[in-house]
């Protein structure tokens, strides 16, 4: 028996709405048994702030700055907090909940899927490992994030290097399908990032920023080498094949599929109703 074959899609740079619409369509097609499990890598046409499904824009986000910088803005269908996508590789994994290798609990499925990330970081020569909250207090902290910024604390089975979080991921389960997507940052500009969020005052903002710097890290901060997106793609292709014990088979969307994605992008992910709904 050979390895199970999964689809592999490298979308390159796309618009914020297209990126979110394709992830949703892949979830739908998986649910309808039209496609095998899929690994997707993608980038962003412009630096883009994504917010979690439950996040309240007016409470957390400084939209004046987002608009002033001409950044993209879109709401994800996954939970979690705000992420600035810039100078990063973004990934998504779409697989049926009843896949024989997928555990039933969210955290354990997260661990299985994230093994691909772990092996990808190792392929880059980084000593990555899972963060598991050790104490009851640490576990409680996961339920009460300190700010609207995603990377400010490692959660269950988040991947860390030298004690700092290196990949931010979120998961949703709909229609019997798991969608997990997340960021693999080459660089993080803290000033750019924190200008996009609302804080009670400047002092709180600076405190959060310094806490973030002690808890999160990007790949190029960790090594004398400067990696490119192309090198990341190669490393994480290897990582997911090894971590999930599958063979990735390149896949191109059909014209019909592309049209479905573009329609969903326009009708949902470009709409104010969706993006500002909370």
Swiss-Prot record:
Pathway: Protein modification; protein lipoylation via endogenous pathway; protein N(6)-(lipoyl)lysine from octanoyl-[acyl-carrier-protein]. Gene3D superfamilies: Bira Bifunctional Protein, Domain 2 (3.30.930.10). It catalyses: octanoyl-[ACP] + L-lysyl-[protein] = N(6)-octanoyl-L-lysyl-[protein] + holo-[ACP] + H(+). The lineage of its organism: Bacteria, Bacillati, Bacillota, Bacilli, Bacillales. The keyword Lipid metabolism does not apply. It holds the Pfam family LplA-B_cat. The record marks 165 as: Lowers pKa of active site Cys. It comes from Bacillus anthracis. In the reaction, the free carboxyl group of octanoic acid is attached via an amide linkage to the epsilon-amino group of a specific lysine residue of lipoyl domains of lipoate-dependent enzymes. The reaction proceeds via an octanoyl-thioester enzyme intermediate. Catalyzes the transfer of endogenously produced octanoic acid from octanoyl-acyl-carrier-protein onto the lipoyl domain of GcvH, an intermediate carrier during protein lipoylation. GO terms for molecular function: lipoyl(octanoyl) transferase activity. This is Octanoyltransferase LipM. Monomer. Belongs to the octanoyltransferase LipM family. HAMAP family: LipM.
């Amino acid at each position: 028996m050979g390895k199970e074959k999964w689809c592999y899609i490298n979308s390159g740079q796309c618009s914020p709405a297209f990126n979110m619409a394709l992830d949703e369509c892949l979830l739908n097609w998986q649910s309808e048994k039209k496609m095998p499990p899929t690994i997707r890598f993608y980038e962003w046409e412009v630096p883009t702030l994504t917010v979690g499904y439950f996040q309240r824009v007016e409470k957390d986000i400084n939209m004046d700055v987002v608009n002033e910088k001409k950044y993209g803005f879109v709401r994800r269908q996954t939970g979690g907090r705000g992420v600035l996508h810039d100078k990063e590789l973004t990934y998504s994994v779409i697989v049926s909940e009843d896949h024989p290798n997928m555990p039933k609990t969210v955290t354990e499925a997260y661990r299985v899927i994230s093994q691909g990330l772990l092996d990808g970081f190792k392929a880059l020569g980084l000593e990555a490992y899972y963060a598991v909250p050790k104490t009851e207090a640490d576990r409680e902290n996961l339920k009460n994030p300190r700010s609207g910024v995603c990377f400010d604390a490692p959660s269950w089975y988040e991947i860390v290097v030298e004690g700092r979080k290196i990949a931010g991921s979120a998961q949703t389960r709909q229609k019997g399908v798991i969608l997990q997507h997340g960021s693999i940052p080459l660089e993080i500009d803290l000033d750019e990032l924190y200008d996009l969020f609302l804080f009670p005052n400047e002092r709180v903002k600076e405190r959060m920023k310094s806490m973030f710097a002690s808890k999160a890290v990007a790949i190029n901060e960790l090594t004398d080498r400067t990696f490119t997106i192309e090198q990341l793609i190669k490393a994480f292709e290897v990582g997911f094949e090894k971590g999930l014990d599958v063979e990735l088979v390149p896949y191109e969307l059909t014209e019909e599929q592309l049209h479905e994605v573009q329609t969903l992008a326009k009708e949902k992910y470009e709409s104010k109703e969706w993006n500002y709904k909370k």
